[in-house]
Curated annotation (Swiss-Prot):
<keyword id="KW-1133">Transmembrane helix</keyword>
<dbReference type="Pfam" id="PF13520">
    <property type="entry name" value="AA_permease_2"/>
</dbReference>
<feature type="transmembrane region" description="Helical">
    <location>
        <begin position="156"/>
        <end position="176"/>
    </location>
</feature>
<dbReference type="GO" id="GO:0022857">
    <property type="term" value="F:transmembrane transporter activity"/>
</dbReference>
<feature type="transmembrane region" description="Helical">
    <location>
        <begin position="36"/>
        <end position="56"/>
    </location>
</feature>
<dbReference type="InterPro" id="IPR004754">
    <property type="entry name" value="Amino_acid_antiprt"/>
</dbReference>
<feature type="transmembrane region" description="Helical">
    <location>
        <begin position="87"/>
        <end position="107"/>
    </location>
</feature>
<keyword id="KW-1003">Cell membrane</keyword>
<feature type="transmembrane region" description="Helical">
    <location>
        <begin position="208"/>
        <end position="228"/>
    </location>
</feature>
<dbReference type="InterPro" id="IPR050367">
    <property type="entry name" value="APC_superfamily"/>
</dbReference>
<comment type="function">
    <text>Could be an amino acid transporter.</text>
</comment>
<feature type="transmembrane region" description="Helical">
    <location>
        <begin position="338"/>
        <end position="358"/>
    </location>
</feature>
<feature type="transmembrane region" description="Helical">
    <location>
        <begin position="289"/>
        <end position="309"/>
    </location>
</feature>
<keyword id="KW-0813">Transport</keyword>
<keyword id="KW-0812">Transmembrane</keyword>
<feature type="transmembrane region" description="Helical">
    <location>
        <begin position="364"/>
        <end position="384"/>
    </location>
</feature>
<dbReference type="GO" id="GO:0005886">
    <property type="term" value="C:plasma membrane"/>
</dbReference>
Length: 481
């Protein structure tokens, strides 16, 4: 690839930050305060920050230890555990983010309803579907023009989404009162005048926020996913660190500073996006306008970068023979043209179906969301494998082997916790979607290696187990329906 078309540390950090900071962050104060006090929220961010650090650090170490393993999440799966595992990582990531991107379309239209009521109410009426489809194909052509150009536009979008958050935090900083913040700090009292109620013990409060804190870091792998287009793998490591620190700081301040201006009870009852409700109360209607514009910019920026990311993995998998060959096509701008087109067509079909889906859409979004989580676990397990067996682990990088092994062990424990916290039932149903990819893998293997068996002996047993679990998942799916 032409070096001029490769991504530097700023563009890569923009990918990470934009992938994590979606429109949902603008309702974080209410989400966190719904059933937790300031003290519990603080503990929750400390626990999550430590856990996610081991995931982020895994990506940093692997980028340095295996600079040849570009398009990380997919490649780590294949190098560590074979082509079938690598395929499942690419397939799962691709499908789940196709659904997630359609979620951005619905959220964008619903956000536009603030400025143009009631035309886009709910985000899934026919006008919303039409306008969402228009944005979907505009993003397709932007990415088709080149990943470098899309990433440059994303840097502008990232700045655009950070500015409203900076205004919000600055206003709150000057309005912050320690006396308010420490009133019922642990949520163990009932204070009627500020709408506070006894929230129960500290542990239940922390647990109630953990699901929120887990999901807001989805996208930490952003720089790794597009690492095949990075100028340097060192830049991938730096970008992951910058993205993690920036988002952790923003999330913590967004959750805690409002509790120095309003009580937990007051914030928990605010309408989404709660940042708009807070700023409107403090500086008037302009505050609400600023934050709602921020939501729209955040959605567009995240939608753009997730489109880049979800088209990369099938492209990389096709290059190594675990996706059909046609997905390896690039255009003159070195954009993964067929992978991008296939992704956009899938998203278009899903977007049309959203109009009819109702509650089924929310359930499907929850199911597909958990499909990204095994990618984290496979990455930490791969790091453990190369450090434990000392498989050519380099001695000249920033992380010594023992340090990397500790990171891998703790990251793996946290990865298992992520899957457990997401819900075993949802994971079982998600396995149905994983199993649907098996024919695609078989087709790809027959195309690239017609004289070899599609599966190794271990992979064959793994595929059988996957199919059995998928059948169990179907039972759960029919129960939910």
């Amino acid at each position: 690839m032409n070096d001029n078309k490769k991504l530097g540390v700023i563009a890569l950090a923009g990918v990470v930050i934009s992938a994590m900071l979606g429109g949902g962050v603008y309702n974080l104060p209410q989400n966190m305060a719904q059933s937790a006090s300031a003290g519990a929220i603080l503990i929750s961010w400390i626990i999550t920050g430590i856990g996610i650090w081991f995931i982020a650090n895994t990506f940093r170490i692997l980028a340095a230890a295996r600079p040849d393993a570009t398009t990380g999440i997919y490649t780590y799966g294949e190098l560590g555990f074979g082509k079938f595992t690598g395929f499942l990582m690419a397939w799962g990531y691709w499908i789940c983010n196709s659904f997630a991107n359609v979620g951005y379309a619905v959220l964008l239209m619903d956000s536009l309803n603030y400025f143009f009521p009631p035309y886009f109410k709910g985000g899934n009426n026919w006008l919303s579907i039409a306008c969402g489809s228009l944005v979907l194909w505009i993003i397709f052509f932007i990415v088709l023009a080149g990943v470098k150009q899309a990433s440059a536009l994303n840097v502008i979008g990232t700045i655009g989404k950070l500015l409203p958050l900076a205004i919000f935090l600055l206003v709150l900083l000057f309005s912050f009162r320690f006396s308010t913040f420490f009133t019922d700090f642990w949520g163990l009292k009932t204070v009627a005048k500020v709408h506070d109620t006894n929230l129960g013990g500290i542990l239940p409060q922390v647990k109630s926020t953990m699901l929120v804190t887990l999901w807001v870091f989805t996208g930490i792998e952003g720089a790794v996913v597009v690492s095949g287009r990075a100028k340097s793998q060192k830049d991938v490591s730096k970008a992951t660190f910058l993205g993690f620190i920036t988002c952790l700081l923003i999330y913590t301040l967004l959750s805690l500073l409002p509790l120095g201006v309003y009580s937990q009870g007051e914030i928990s009852k605010m309408a989404p996006p709660s940042t708009a409700a807070v700023l409107m109360d403090l500086i008037g209607n302009w505050g609400s306008v600023i934050m709602n514009l921020g939501v729209i910019i955040a959605i567009l920026s995240s939608w753009l970068i997730w489109t880049v990311m979800l088209s990369e993995l099938p492209f990389a998998a096709a290059q190594s023979g675990t996706f059909p060959k046609i997905f390896a096509k690039e255009n003159k701008n070195e954009s993964p043209s067929f992978s991008l087109l296939a992704s956009t067509i899938i998203m278009q079909i899903i977007l049309i179906l959203v109009h009819f889906a109702g509650n089924a859409w929310n359930m499907m979004l929850s199911i597909t969301s958990v499909m990204a989580l095994p990618c984290y676990l496979v990455s930490t397990l791969y790091l453990f494998k190369i450090t434990y067996k000392n498989e050519n682990y380099p001695t000249d990088i920033f992380a010594k082997r023992k340090y990397a092994m500790i990171t891998a062990i703790l990251g793996s424990i946290y990865g298992v916790w992520l899957i457990y916290a997401a819900g075993i039932n949802y994971m079982l149903i998600a396995i149905v979607i994983y199993a649907l990819g098996i024919p695609v893998f078989i087709k790809a293997r027959r195309e690239t290696s017609p004289n070899e068996k599609e599966f190794t002996k271990v992979e064959r047993y793994f595929a059988i187990v996957l199919i059995i679990l998928a059948l169990i998942g179907l039972v759960y799916l029919f129960k939910f329906m």
